[in-house]
């Protein structure tokens, strides 16, 4: 049986798959008559997280409007994963214990491509007074202005960049009476609302300067009572479609569950598989109202609290643990993160980094408990066998990640004084492990290709001449790296950690098959 509106009626009696009970036809009529929510970015994080929130409100009778989703970059997603299935999708929640929840999501009322016809639909929606918010999951690159400066010379309605198109759509709303609206980035990048606001304002300034827009439009954009750009923190892993999940759905009676690659290399399917844990924290600044998403688990708070939650996640409770697992996971030749965390030594290592060295200096938000967050990460999220995240994916661009994932913690210890930073063991051990990784030889002595990193070639060049079992001149080779504040937030020698990292590195490079012995030695202290 193919996934479509007709199937929903058939499946309502089945306990294995949860189906919505609301009248979707009625919801569609109400939504198109007076839309409240437009979303840009039709990928998995939207389908597997954002759309499920509104689905819950509809199911609970707390809203009578759905979402209109727009795809501007990879319109094949609409053609292959939305239109053939009446804009429905199966949300599959992958749990740590191996069980799954399957639910049909019906909250997407219309899917729009950025072609000529779609463009006219978007202008119509933006001009509607009822529109409360426009949200985005377009990745951090989507907010770039520098790549599209040629757009400044075009007419606004002919813009080729999403940020230019968004600016023009906001201008259409302004010209139609200037009703308030919230423009909300839900992308996984810090200060995302600021990035979005700066991009829109830059386009507006350039077009105003060239006489293509009214000067007063800038005032409209800069008044938070009329146009707001709330910040947010989002956290949920929604990997590409999993073949095991596909097989499970076919066994459950779905006929067509193809996993297809679009022409722009996006893997799509009529289903989305995702982990069970999810967080969405949003600055509560919505000048035209908003759906009551707090009833679906979204946390609404101040901008300061959003930023504190982001720092907690990125600097202490998730990302540093990910990087530690990725480094030693690559060295020990693990293919997935759940395999890596299944090694008791690596599990202990991330526990020590998180609980013992991270939590004492964590940026602690009021709305999320850092201890509980780490506990979920270590006990539920990282060991999830369905997620299939790879150490080799996470290890990419580590030179850019180190200053945030470990540097902020090191700076916090430095500010405390009393030589507390010198007492750290496990963060310096991870730094030594990263230098060991840069040699391009795993623990068994086999060569591998070091992952992509903008500073990778320079760092590897600095370590030339160091081999397993031949590690003279360690200080000479490591000093330029360990003293580099742009890598670690501090000069590791000046804070009393440089020599310690050198010592750990010497042990990690003493021979083949020593890494687990070194980890065991320091974890047992």
Indicate residue ranges for each PLM-predicted region.
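Substrate/ligand-engaging "lid" and interaction regions
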Residues: 1-525
